[in-house]
UniProtKB/Swiss-Prot annotation:
It comes from Prochlorococcus marinus (strain MIT 9215). Signal peptide: none annotated. Its EC number is 7.1.1.-. The keyword Translocase applies. Keywords: Membrane, NAD, NADP, Plastoquinone, Quinone, Thylakoid, Translocase, Transmembrane, Transmembrane helix. This is NAD(P)H-quinone oxidoreductase subunit 1. One of its GO terms (biological process) is photosynthesis, light reaction. Belongs to the complex I subunit 1 family. NDH-1 shuttles electrons from an unknown electron donor, via FMN and iron-sulfur (Fe-S) centers, to quinones in the respiratory and/or the photosynthetic chain. The immediate electron acceptor for the enzyme in this species is believed to be plastoquinone. Couples the redox reaction to proton translocation, and thus conserves the redox energy in a proton gradient. NDH-1 is composed of at least 11 different subunits. The chain crosses the membrane at residues 27-47, 97-117, 128-148, 176-196, 204-224, 266-286, 308-328, 347-367. The keyword Membrane applies. One of its GO terms (cellular component) is plasma membrane-derived thylakoid membrane.
Length: 372
């Protein structure tokens, strides 16, 4: 399936119409994908924060934000502006360099991970052959930033929160990677594009969630733990650690943690939709739509329609998972730190390893169903 809107090609052709050379058009294009990722991530965070406030209000029989814009849609922007104008404080006995580097080291890998998220056949920033491996590698950097922030704050609550965050992230990253390996084993590829295309054979029935139900559950639990969402928010448990590794942070440094947490949640939901829910896949084949409209499959109208539907389907699937994550936050109690680590090491790790071995066996026995 090599159809779909190619943004880079279309943009370069548009600039060539003004007499610019291919080299200049390519140079102009280079910074745009990263800018597009930043805008998409920030807009996604604003929507998610608004949903969080409204869903939490409904769970507690409240109204939630209603005065800042219609239905309170401007409340997340007001929150961001408030953090933007707050004083940036560095504690007197803190390590200033590490204290500042910590939030950056937490946020940057999460944003870079968006580079491998496809919204269509050609709608992604970087179609690297090792896309999933790159995401796992980038996500392993985050615990360093969390531990660095806790240590540099020179605060016992911050240090304990940083240690908890690092232990939690390491504990759940291994079963998460093993559940992803089962998908890679069936797809024979680390490319996110190939993983989605492999699920396009029979519509919804070819989604990986039917062949990897255990992997799906393990991945989603681990993703929630990596995002430090309830019931796994031990690193910043208010009743125990004030705000964990964020205790001494204020202003934009605190906003970077806040932003990184929500961007990571949206990223995790997008990856679940790509790995297990068919990504941009539409129930009706594009070939039938093109035939119905009596147009070739590479016609501009079909390409725009395919790109639009791909974005809508990917985002809808992702936000369904975000809704579930928000609902879990306001309906489940927090686990203890020993229960958290026991769940990761003694339960999810053996299950994910067994799931990988069973997938390998099923691939040998039923190659037509498990990607022989």
């Amino acid at each position: 399936m090599d159809y779909g809107l190619d943004l880079e090609y279309s943009f370069n052709e548009f600039l060539k119409g003004f007499g610019l050379s291919s080299e200049i058009a390519h140079i102009i294009w280079l910074p745009l994908p990263m800018l597009l990722v930043l805008v998409a991530a920030v807009v996604g965070v604003l929507v998610t924060v608004w949903l969080e406030r409204k869903i939490s209000a409904a769970a507690q029989q409240r109204i939630g934000p209603e005065y800042a814009g219609a239905l309170g849609v401007l409340q997340p922007i007001a929150d961001g502006l408030k953090l933007l104008v707050k004083e940036d404080i560095i504690p007197a006995k803190a390590d200033g360099i590490l204290f500042t580097a910590g939030p950056i080291l937490v946020l940057v890998p999460v944003i870079l991970s968006w580079l491998i998220v496809p919204f269509g056949q050609n709608l992604l920033i970087s179609n690297v052959g090792i896309g999933i491996f790159l995401w796992i590698a980038l996500s392993s950097i985050q615990p360093i930033g969390l531990l660095m922030s806790g240590y540099a704050s020179n605060n016992k609550y911050s240090l304990l929160g940083g240690l908890r965050a690092a232990a939690q992230s390491i504990s759940y990253e291994i079963p998460l990677a093993l559940s992803v390996l089962a998908i890679v084993l069936m797809t024979n590829s680390l490319s996110t594009i190939d993983i989605v295309n492999q699920q396009s054979g029979a519509g919804i029935l070819s989604w990986n969630i039917w062949r990897q139900p255990v992997g799906f559950i393990v991945f989603w639990i681990c993703a929630l733990a990596e995002c430090e969402r309830l019931p796994f928010d031990l690193p910043e448990a208010e009743e125990e650690l004030v705000a964990g590794y964020q205790t001494e942070y204020a202003g934009m440094k605190f906003a970077l943690f806040y932003l990184g947490s929500y961007i990571n949640l949206i990223l995790s939901a997008l990856l679940v939709s790509i790995l297990y829910l068919g990504g941009w896949g539409f129930p009706i084949p594009v070939e039938l739509i093109a035939k119905f409209l009596n147009l070739p499959i590479n016609a501009p109208l079909i390409q725009v329609f395919t790109a639009s539907i791909g974005i809508v389907m990917t985002v809808l699937k992702a936000y369904l998972l975000v809704f579930i994550a928000i609902l879990l936050r306001w309906t489940t109690p927090r686990v203890r730190i020993d229960q958290l680590l026991d769940l990761g090491w003694k339960f999810l790790l053996p299950i994910s390893l067994a799931n990988l071995l069973i997938t390998a066996g099923l691939k040998l026995a039923f190659p037509q169903f498990f990607g022989g």
